[in-house]
Swiss-Prot record:
Keywords: Transferase, tRNA processing. GO terms for biological process: tRNA wobble uridine modification. Carboxy-S-adenosyl-L-methionine binds at residues 91, 105, 110, 130, 152-154, 181-182, 196, 200, 315. This is tRNA U34 carboxymethyltransferase. Catalyzes carboxymethyl transfer from carboxy-S-adenosyl-L-methionine (Cx-SAM) to 5-hydroxyuridine (ho5U) to form 5-carboxymethoxyuridine (cmo5U) at position 34 in tRNAs. PANTHER family: METHYLTRANSFERASE (PTHR43464), TRNA U34 CARBOXYMETHYLTRANSFERASE (PTHR43464:SF95).
Length: 330
């Protein structure tokens, strides 16, 4: 069974220590609820990942663990087969002892768009909401973060993260918790909170913004990336049914509307630092994610539209600062 004891130990003398009042019981219940299904099979695979300490580790410019020269061809093939059990791999890419995991998303491209605009992560405590397999968490560590915590309720994503962590060495202060943000108490402790690719999946985007705010210390920084559409501060798209074949997309605001939402939630220093139309090169099917991808979600006769006729995916990154609460509104 995947253990969270090292995380408890790392936060016992940190700004997150009060989380220990509730977190062990929540994760204990999660473990009891997942004794069956795919998780036990995946954990057996994780237990087979015994490899020498990597001769190269790079989280600054990529996520690379090992040069590939430490393993024989047979050992590398075995590793590739083990990692293949965790398909589909959506966020990456990873280079693991010479095994190149070409994921559906070029998450490194998103990181390169975002990182020049954020406050330096050196010595900061960071939360990544909806972290997926944890690719960006490793890049946050590469920027010098003191602690990185990722939350995502997916057992598969957790096992993908654990596979990478076991190959990297478990001593790194990067931890995945299989939780949704609604399961977190107001911690008021993180220096930076990332929410990238989550907001449009939430039925109540304002509530989600408040949940993000509750995790930040006063003066902490929010990095919010989500789907947007063109328009003024009153423009919000609510898909009638599906958007890009997804049935869990609820609200797509304009950039101005999104910034207004953040202002209403008592954030300051709100700025849009990037707007980018998702390209077919950034999101596509690969050997490691052989299912449908972006090209299948767009109108074959007009890639500026989804198959439903809505504007094709465009993503904006907004950065904002948690303000002191306005006591007149409490």
């Amino acid at each position: 069974m995947i253990s969270f004891s090292s995380f408890y130990k790392q936060i016992s003398d940190s700004s997150l220590q009060h989380w220990l009042e509730t977190l062990p019981s929540i994760l204990g219940q999660w473990q009891r609820d997942h004794k069956h299904g795919s998780l036990p099979k995946w954990e057996k695979v994780l237990n087979k990942l015994h490899y020498p300490d990597a001769d190269i580790i790079d989280f600054k410019t990529s996520v690379k663990i090992g040069s590939g020269e430490q393993l024989s061809d047979g050992e590398r093939e075995k590793l590739e087969n083990l990692l293949g059990i965790f398909k589909p791999w959506r966020k990456g890419p990873y280079s693991l002892h010479g095994v190149e995991i070409d994921t559906e998303w070029r998450s490194d491209w998103k990181w390169e768009r975002v990182v020049p605009h954020i406050s330096p992560l050196a010595n900061r405590t960071v939360l990544d909401v909806g972290c997926g397999s944890g690719y960006h968490m490793w890049r946050m560590l590469g920027e010098g973060a003191k602690h990185v915590v990722g939350i995502d309720p997916s057992p598969l994503f957790m096992c993908q993260f654990e596979a990478v962590k076991r190959l990297a060495g478990n001593e790194h202060p990067v931890h995945f918790l299989p939780l949704g943000i609604e399961e977190l108490p107001p911690l008021d402790a993180f220096d930076t909170v990332f929410s990238m690719g989550v907001l449009y999946h939430r039925r109540s985007p304002i509530d989600h913004i408040y949940q993000l705010r509750d995790q930040l210390r006063t003066g902490g920084e929010l990095v919010l990336e989500t789907l947007v559409i063109d328009g003024d501060e009153n423009t919000v798209l609510v898909p009638k049914d599906r958007y890009g074949k997804m049935n869990n997309v609820w609200f797509l605001p304009s950039v101005d509307a999104l910034m207004l939402w953040l202002k209403k939630c008592d954030f300051t220093d709100i700025r849009c630092v990037d707007v980018d139309v998702t390209s077919l090169a950034e999101q596509r099917s690969t050997q490691w994610m052989p299912n449908e991808s972006l090209v299948d979600y767009l109108d074959p006769n007009d890639v500026s539209l989804t198959v439903e006729g809505y504007p094709a995916p465009k993503r904006a990154t907004i950065i904002a600062t948690k303000n002191q609460p306005n006591k007149d509104l409490i």
